[in-house]
């Protein structure tokens, strides 16, 4: 099957959205699907306001349409609500091409936090963007219910995974953390206001606080919290070693849709302390034993983050590892594939040289066999 993924989030950006999309693309290619990624490096870009390290495509509308026509995709998936996402969405709507979208980020909440604009105003924009899609992919049932409450009822469950060959409890701890006073409390992620890292750094708890990540709030937090250790962004084996060195992983965000870092921590045998909000609730569970029926606690959720940390210190590290086993990227990729829009409607032919790429259709009926492959 030939799949186009249109996304404003791509390398060299470092965040959970990019990891989720790129890992899924790799998985699809490993299943012998042809995947074309329409991403910012294909265009002139400009720095995103307040996020200069994120580059947004400039004037990409016509080019995105031409690329979609040239690629001749069987299915189109639009991952983000940025310029590339809007260009792909508008092309699909104009040409009657079915497409799916994903809701990776609580964009209405983030905009409201940063600008004071009421979140409901942004939800109107989200309904406009996602409304025409065949389905909107969501990481958790809680997020699906939230979208349905905002009049976006067509959702598809697409969870996240963890690479268990990379994130596991066996291996050396990070050398910068081994001699720190215990307990060692770790936070990993973008260092930005919406991630609520300051709530972690303000927690009145004993031990050492370590922050792994980069972002627009890093310099200010480093200057203010000199007793914390800031290691910057880490990847792969070095990131896994940071998890292993920790006694508790602290996730202070109240706005994440999932929190991929939570299952990375669990895979390394590190219990999670978080607020009882969507994301942590969908991973740790109401009973704090994980959502897959574990017998002992893998973390702690509490409206008082300090209390959550204290309880998480007594959680079962082996149970945390066992819970993470359920998060297979192969399963996640197959669920992604299952949710793609059935390609039973019109798909544009490749335009001749110099022709408009936007207006000619040819109908192609497709059927899906049990393997997920399509035959015309």
Identify the residue ranges that each predicted region occupies:
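Nucleotide-activated donor-binding/catalytic signature segment of Leloir-type glycosyltransferases, i.e.
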Residues: 219-238
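Short hydrophobic beta-strand element within catalytic cores of glycosyltransferases
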Residues: 271-276, 284-285
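Donor nucleotide-sugar binding/catalytic pocket of nucleotide-sugar-dependent glycosyltransferases
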Residues: 124-172
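Aromatic "clamp/platform" in nucleotide-sugar-dependent glycosyltransferases that forms part
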Residues: 254
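A charged, aromatic-enriched C-terminal amphipathic alpha-helix characteristic of glycosyltransferases
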Residues: 314-344, 348-349
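Short alpha-helical donor nucleotide-sugar binding micro-motif in glycosyltransferases
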Residues: 68, 130, 241-246, 336
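Conserved donor-binding/catalytic core segment of Leloir-type glycosyltransferases
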Residues: 176-210
């Amino acid at each position: 099957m030939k799949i186009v993924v249109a996304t404003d989030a791509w390398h060299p950006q470092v965040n959970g959205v990019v990891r989720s999309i790129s890992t899924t693309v790799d998985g699809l290619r490993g299943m012998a699907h042809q995947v074309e990624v329409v991403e910012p490096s294909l265009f002139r870009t400009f720095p995103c306001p307040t996020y200069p390290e994120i580059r947004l495509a400039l004037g990409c509308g016509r080019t995105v349409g031409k690329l979609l026509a040239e690629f001749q995709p069987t299915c189109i998936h639009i991952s983000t609500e940025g310029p590339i996402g809007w260009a792909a969405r508008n092309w699909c709507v104009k040409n009657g091409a079915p497409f799916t979208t994903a809701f990776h980020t609580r964009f209405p909440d983030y905009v409201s936090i940063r600008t004071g604009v009421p979140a409901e105003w942004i939800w109107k924009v989200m309904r406009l963007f996602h409304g025409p899609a065949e389905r909107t992919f969501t990481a958790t049932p809680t997020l699906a219910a939230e979208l349905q409450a905002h009049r976006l009822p067509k959702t598809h469950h697409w969870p996240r995974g963890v690479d268990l060959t990379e994130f596991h409890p066996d291996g050396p701890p990070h050398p910068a953390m081994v001699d720190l006073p215990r307990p060692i409390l770790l936070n990993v992620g973008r260092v930005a206001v919406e991630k609520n890292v300051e709530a972690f750094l303000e927690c009145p708890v004993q031990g050492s606080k370590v922050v792994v990540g980069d972002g627009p709030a890093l310099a200010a937090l480093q200057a203010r919290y000199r007793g914390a250790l800031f290691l910057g962004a880490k990847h792969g084996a070095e990131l896994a070693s940071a998890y292993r060195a920790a006694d508790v992983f602290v996730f202070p965000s109240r706005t994440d849709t999932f929190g991929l870092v939570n299952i990375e921590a669990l895979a390394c045998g590190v219990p999670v302390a978080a607020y009882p909000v969507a994301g942590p609730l969908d991973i740790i569970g109401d009973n704090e034993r994980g959502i897959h029926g574990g017998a002992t606690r893998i973390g702690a959720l509490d409206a008082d983050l300090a209390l959550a940390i204290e309880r998480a210190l007594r959680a079962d590290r082996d149970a945390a590892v066992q819970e993470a086993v359920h998060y297979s990227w192969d399963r996640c990729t197959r669920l992604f594939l299952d949710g793609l829009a059935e390609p039973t409607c019109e798909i544009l032919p490749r335009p001749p040289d110099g022709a408009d790429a936007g207006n000619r259709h040819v109908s192609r009926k497709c059927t899906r066999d049990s393997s997920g492959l399509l035959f015309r």
